[in-house]
Design a protein with these regions (language model features):
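Intrinsically disordered, low-complexity regulatory regions in eukaryotic proteins
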Residues: 1-82, 86-142
Length: 142
């Protein structure tokens, strides 16, 4: 096997490995985005369920299986992150609108990442085929 053949095979193998790592990273990012999207959908559903005249004795989840009982006044607002860790109280309709927009943006990002994943996967398959063909031709020469 010539030095050029070895170098080319090593380059292809490295590229395949880099692509595999990138695909794994994209999968992890998409999974995290999906968790965020589901959390936002649940929040939208919860906010939408608050009646305009408020609610008495509503159970508000704090996390870790803990809830607090509270009264929700009529025409209440929700405190929402508006960016750069700045939070502001917004009317429920506006908070729902903001969350809906964020959910749509996450879906767009997830779709772009899935397209990128498919492109990398296609390239990786092509490189793997070239690698296998070169290995087969080298073995045939011996």
């Amino acid at each position: 096997m010539s030095a050029v053949d070895k170098a080319e095979l090593q380059r292809i193998a490295q590229q395949v490995e880099l692509n595999r790592q990138r695909m794994e990273s994209i999968e992890q990012q998409v999974a995290r985005l999906e968790q965020i999207r589901l959390e936002q959908l649940q929040t939208i559903e919860t906010l939408s369920a608050i009646p305009p005249n408020g609610a008495k004795g509503a159970m508000i989840p704090l996390g870790s299986g803990v809830q607090i009982v509270a009264d929700i006044p009529p025409k209440t607002g929700a405190v929402i992150d508006i960016g750069s860790r700045v939070q502001a109280e917004k009317p429920l309709d506006e908070a729902i609108e903001i969350l809906t927009k964020r959910t749509e943006e996450i879906l767009e990002l997830m779709n772009k990442m899935k397209i990128e994943f498919s492109s990398i996967e296609e390239t990786t398959i092509s490189l793997a085929n070239v690698f296998n063909e070169q290995i087969a031709s080298l073995q045939a020469e011996q």
